[in-house]
Regions:
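Transmembrane-lumen/periplasm boundary regions of multi-pass, lipid-linked membrane glycan transferases
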Residues: 1, 124-125, 132, 137-261, ...
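Specific aromatic-rich, kink-prone transmembrane helix
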Residues: 97-113, 125, 270-274
Length: 314
């Protein structure tokens, strides 16, 4: 494969499918752990870091929206989601993009309390999304920022400044790579830019069909929270922010001609964060059962993953 950090290419490729963040970090892990791990295992170890940072972001945003004590519940719902379990081991840039989406959502959640810090977090999240998945994935962030303007508590000059600073931060991180790619390989640059296929109408129904199993057990709890709070959706940030974010992601996916269930991963974030509030609304016995179910599921899969990993290297 090509050694270029700017445009990492496999031997059979003449254009890039995605920006270089995920392969660059993966290659770094391969180099660091070359003496003890096979390349594909080293890259999967980088997945563990991406997902761990995503979990930290989920905990922070859930605490910001729901208060202390909810972060662990959101994390358990997230890691127990079937879609994550099926895709967490895959060597795909969607894994690193997930951290970007988590940071972006945390940035919006943090806005009212710490607007400047929130703008930095959002800008950094946007950068990770772009440098992992390209520009189309950013559409969901853009749509979310626009839909929030329909809510009175977001419609003020401070919010516009928040969006502006976030954009400046993101551009300052993204622009160097775009500039270097254009200058070093204009053919690859234009090939990548033009690699946008028109949707054919099947995308939306594909994702709706796969939504229930992919987001289980987050989706039922998310719906439960919406039903319980439907009168106050527009007053409660902890409800309307995850809802708008989810709708924006689904709309963006309907425009993505590359149909793949792994593209649903970002929607696990708002579902899990909102669902965390639903656990306290359940009866005490049901909430306790769900809590222990999440702990047991996480423990079981954690044991299985580490068991096979040790078996593979010994």
């Amino acid at each position: 494969s090509s050694n270029s950090i700017i445009a990492p290419l496999a031997a059979s490729q003449d254009s890039i499918n995605n920006p270089p963040l995920y392969p660059f970090i993966g290659a770094t892990f391969v180099k660091i752990f070359s003496s003890i791990l096979a390349p594909h295992d080293a890259i999967r170890l980088s997945n563990f870091i991406w997902i761990s940072l995503t979990l930290v972001s989920i905990g922070l945003m859930t605490r910001e929206l729901w208060g202390t004590g909810f972060g662990r519940q959101a994390g358990l719902i997230f890691i127990a989601s079937i879609g994550l379990i099926f895709n967490v081991h895959t060597i795909r840039p969607e894994v690193s993009a997930l951290l970007g989406f988590a940071l972006a959502l945390y940035g919006f959640a943090l806005y009212h309390r710490r607007p400047f810090r929130a703008s930095l977090v959002l800008g950094f999240g946007i950068s990770i999304i772009f440098l992992s998945n390209g520009i189309l994935s950013l559409l969901s962030i853009f749509i979310t920022s626009l839909t929030l303007l329909f809510i009175k508590q977001w419609r003020n000059k401070r919010y516009y400044l928040f969006c502006l600073i976030s954009s400046i931060v993101a551009l300052s991180i993204i622009s160097p790579w775009v500039y270097l790619l254009y200058n070093s390989n204009p053919e690859i640059f234009f090939s990548w830019i033009n690699k946008v296929n028109a949707p054919n109408g099947e995308e939306f129904f594909f994702y709706i069909k796969n939504l229930l199993w992919f987001t289980w057990p987050a989706l039922p709890l998310f719906i439960f929270v919406l039903i319980k709070n439907y009168r106050n959706i527009f007053q409660l940030k902890k409800i309307h922010l995850p809802l708008f974010f989810s709708i924006s992601i689904l709309f963006t996916l309907s425009l993505n001609a590359k149909i793949d269930q792994i593209n649903l991963m970002p929607i696990l974030l708002p579902f899990s964060v909102a669902a965390a509030g639903g656990i306290d609304l359940l009866r005490r016995s049901s909430a306790s059962a769900l809590n222990w179910f999440g702990i047991l599921i996480f423990g079981f899969f954690g044991f299985i993953i580490w068991f096979f990993w040790f078996a593979a290297i010994t």
